């Protein structure tokens, strides 16, 4: 049986999946890193959708997620989540990161999405140590998919080879084949 969890090294904006997760900031207005890349690739329709969400509900809180159309991306939707800023690990960062992943998965499940692609949330300018963030991601997603049928396929999309190896090692340790 093929694992429901896979690691991909590459550009998340190029994937044809039901939902791409955006590691957003609270404003949802785009920024650096993967957030900026997703906004640039999706085009102005994504920014317009994010502006509408802000008008309706304000900023997106840490650990929460919202969904928008994907604009020019091959995905059906973009799920925007705000991960925690790393402040040394003593400020509920792990719990907030778990909540961010879980919020995305719940939106994917509610929208009947079969596939979802995650970047390494909070590991860029938010400073979350990659190894610790990867452990939270793999544990949270693995726990979720044991209880829910959807999404059927979850991709951890890593920008660099070192991060991809880290995720692959964690999946192998828990008995999943990451390829």
UniProtKB/Swiss-Prot annotation:
One of its GO terms (biological process) is purine nucleoside metabolic process. CDD domains: Macro_OAADPr_deacetylase (cd02908). Gene3D superfamilies: Leucine Aminopeptidase, subunit E, domain 1. Transmembrane segments: none annotated. Coiled coil: none annotated. Belongs to the MacroD-type family. YmdB subfamily. This is O-acetyl-ADP-ribose deacetylase. Homodimer. Interacts with RNase III. Deacetylates O-acetyl-ADP ribose to yield ADP-ribose and free acetate. Down-regulates ribonuclease 3 (RNase III) activity. Acts by interacting directly with the region of the ribonuclease that is required for dimerization/activation. It holds the Pfam family Macro. The gene is ymdB. The active site is at 35 (proton acceptor). Substrate binds at residues 11-12, 25, 33-35, 122-126. InterPro entries: Macro_dom, Macro_dom-like, O-Ac-ADP-ribose_deAcase. Keywords: Hydrolase. It is an enzyme of class 3 (hydrolase). HAMAP family: YmdB. It catalyses: 3''-O-acetyl-ADP-D-ribose + H2O = ADP-D-ribose + acetate + H(+); 2''-O-acetyl-ADP-D-ribose + H2O = ADP-D-ribose + acetate + H(+). Its EC number is 3.1.1.106. One of its GO terms (molecular function) is O-acetyl-ADP-ribose deacetylase activity. Residues 1-175 form the Macro domain.
């Amino acid at each position: 049986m093929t694992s429901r969890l896979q690691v991909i090294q590459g550009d998340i904006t190029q994937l044809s999946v039901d939902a791409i997760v955006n590691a957003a900031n609270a404003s949802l207005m785009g920024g650096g890193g993967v957030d900026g890349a997703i906004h640039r690739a999706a085009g102005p329709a994504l920014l317009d959708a994010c502006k509408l969400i802000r008008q309706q509900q304000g900023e997106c809180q840490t650990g929460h997620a919202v969904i928008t159309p994907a604009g020019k991306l091959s995905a059906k939707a973009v799920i925007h989540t705000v991960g925690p800023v790393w402040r040394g690990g003593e400020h509920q960062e792990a719990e907030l990161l778990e909540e961010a992943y879980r919020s995305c998965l719940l939106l994917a499940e509610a929208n009947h999405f079969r596939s979802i692609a995650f970047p390494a949330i909070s590991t860029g300018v938010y400073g979350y140590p990659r190894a610790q963030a990867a452990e939270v991601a793999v544990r949270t997603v693995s726990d979720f998919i044991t209880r829910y049928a959807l999404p059927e396929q979850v991709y951890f999309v890593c920008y660099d080879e070192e991060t991809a190896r880290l995720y692959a090692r964690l999946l192998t340790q828990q008995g999943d084949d990451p390829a």
